[in-house]
Amino acid sequence: MIASAALTTLLGLGVWFDLRCRRIPNVLTVAGLGAALVLRGVLGVGALVDGVEGAGLALLLSLPPFTLGMLGGGDVKLLVAVGGFMGPVRLIGAFLMIALVGGALALLEALRRRALGEVVSRSFAMVKYLACFGRFGYRPTLEAQGAMTVPYGLAIGVGSVVWWFAAGGRL
């Protein structure tokens, strides 16, 4: 119960900051990871190791999208804190749920901007270029005119909470 309260508080604040400021503060993510590891440490060395492995796996899984500019640094650090709570086994399901929520948010944003056709066309072109040449072609930055961004902290928050409680809501 304490872990559920700590995780939902962390994620609620992360979502709030991401929606309001488009950034997730380091103090929040570090405190979240610290809380996860302390709570796991109380349960024993095995639980603590599980939390460290979950945090490490979250870092490994989120680095590729970060290097491609698909995630911000705050998103990565929030995912690492989530990994500390989830552990490596539940983290895989959480990442899939987060990706589904993030995809739905991106689709809604494209529809809101009336840019769904353009987004689909660019996505196919990017995949085609990657398949033909083994690397990504032109990728507009977030500062490019008309760049579409989604506050991924919202996807992380919703996806993580749904998966946490679906998996039992305990460390």
Where would I find each of the regions flagged by the language model?
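A membrane-topology feature that recognizes alpha-helical transmembrane segments
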Residues: M1-L171
